From Swiss-Prot:
Entry GO MF terms: alternative oxidase activity; metal ion binding
Protein name, as recorded: Alternative oxidase, mitochondrial
Record's subcellular location: Mitochondrion inner membrane
Entry's cofactor comment: Binds 2 iron ions per subunit.
Stated role: Catalyzes cyanide-resistant oxygen consumption. May increase respiration when the cytochrome respiratory pathway is restricted, or in response to low temperatures.
Keywords of this entry: Electron transport, Iron, Membrane, Metal-binding, Mitochondrion, Mitochondrion inner membrane, Oxidoreductase, Respiratory chain, Transit peptide, Transmembrane, Transmembrane helix, Transport
Highest taxon of the lineage: Eukaryota
Species of origin: Ajellomyces capsulatus (Darling's disease fungus)
Binding residue positions for Fe cation 2: 198, 249, 304, 307
Length: 356
């Protein structure tokens, strides 16, 4: 399916020239051992402003820089985000747990059934399988055992789709607010910030791999189908869509939990001591000594857990009436209430009578 020769081709990993097989490659040879021939080109960058090519099988004229600095700008150095990520503590991130909200009505069952079908299809497409709940000690068949390459393929594919719901919901609520000439009561900002956060997950993983044409084609098809499907569904039932995203984030928390366990148990040796990309360090404000791929997975899992809570909470509200509890000021700030931080996490969401 993939070409087998030609170092100038973007999709294949070819042996590096002899003059480069020395100390220059030492930081990354471990990270990419066994991954040659992958449609994803693994590379490791020690610093964001380094021009040194630690690993790449693509000739210089074919390399596509995903994080190129601004061009033809005399005064602008970089773009600064408006949405600063809240600081998560190590204790908060390690307390995140797998959880499931039981379906209570037909809307919940539609959302849950759709998520389970999509999970099955995605697992099939990415060659993923984990032990069933209650059977964590059972060894997964060899063909389904995850490697660094398989994990990053799965992460990239999932994150390209995960940023769609927040953008669609925010866009439709924005248009609704304009059309009805009424306030949105804080929903738009939270939904757009969620989409932005998911995109930052993707950009972080793109520092570990460069997708080939087949992955890009899969993403194009999945995004086209999912965007339009979610668009129509949100017009019909926003509540069902938020419940769907809540269940989807439950699966995301489960996926990242399994990845963390694999890494901590030594099943992913190439990531054992690999530093997190600079873009991730800056976005999550990672402290010194806590800037590895393992730490990155903990941060992303905490994000997904928060999205799980937010969407389950939004699904519990009256969609066209209630204000967004995550963008609200409360009469008693000392009482437990929804926040953007991970200080308080309710996996199954806040009930309406708890926040409104």
């Amino acid at each position: 399916m993939y070409p087998t020769s030609g170092c100038a081709r973007v999709l294949m990993a070819c042996p590096a020239p002899a003059m480069l097989r020395g100390p220059l490659l030492r930081p990354s040879t471990t990270a990419i051992r066994g991954l040659r021939g992958s449609p994803l080109l693994y590379h490791y960058a020690a610093t964001s402003n380094s021009n040194m090519r630690y690993f790449s099988s693509t000739s210089r004229r074919w390399i596509k820089e995903f994080f190129a600095p601004p061009k033809e700008t005399d005064h602008i150095v970089e773009s600064v985000t408006t949405w600063k990520h809240p600081v998560f503590t190590e204790k908060q991130m390690k307390e995140i747990a797998i959880a499931h909200r039981e379906a209570k009505n037909w809307s919940d069952w539609v959302a849950l059934g759709t998520v389970r079908f999509l999970r099955w299809a995605t697992d099939l497409a990415t060659g993923y399988r984990h032990a069933a709940p209650g059977k964590q000690g059972v060894e997964v068949p060899e063909q389904f055992q995850m490697t660094e390459r398989k994990w990053v393929i799965r992460f990239i594919f999932l994150e390209t789709v995960a940023g769609v719901p927040g953008m669609v919901g925010g866009m439709l609520r924005h248009l609704r607010s304009l059309r009805r000439m009424k306030r949105d009561n804080g929903w738009i900002e939270t939904l757009l910030e969620e989409a932005y956060n998911e995109r930052m997950h993707l950009l972080s993983f793109l520092k570990l791999a460069q997708p080939g044409w087949f992955m890009r084609l899969m993403v194009l098809g999945a995004q086209g189908v999912f965007f339009n499907g979610f668009f129509i569904s949100y017009l019909i039932s926003p509540r069902t869509c938020h419940r769907f995203v809540g269940y989807l984030e439950e699966e995301a928390v489960m996926t990242y939990t399994h990845a963390i366990k694999d890494l901590e148990s030594g099943k992913l040796p190439n990531w054992a001591n690999q530093p997190a990309p600079d873009i991730a360090v800056a976005y999550w404000q990672m402290p010194e000594g806590k800037r590895t791929i393992l730490d990155l997975l903990y941060y992303i899992r905490a994000d997904e857990a928060k999205h799980r809570e937010v969407n389950h909470t939004l699904a519990n509200l009256k969609q066209g009436v209630d204000p967004n509890p995550y963008a609200a000021k409360y009469d008693n700030p000392e009482a437990p209430h929804p926040t953007k931080s991970a200080e308080i996490v309710k996996p199954t969401g806040w009930e309406r009578d708890e926040v409104i």
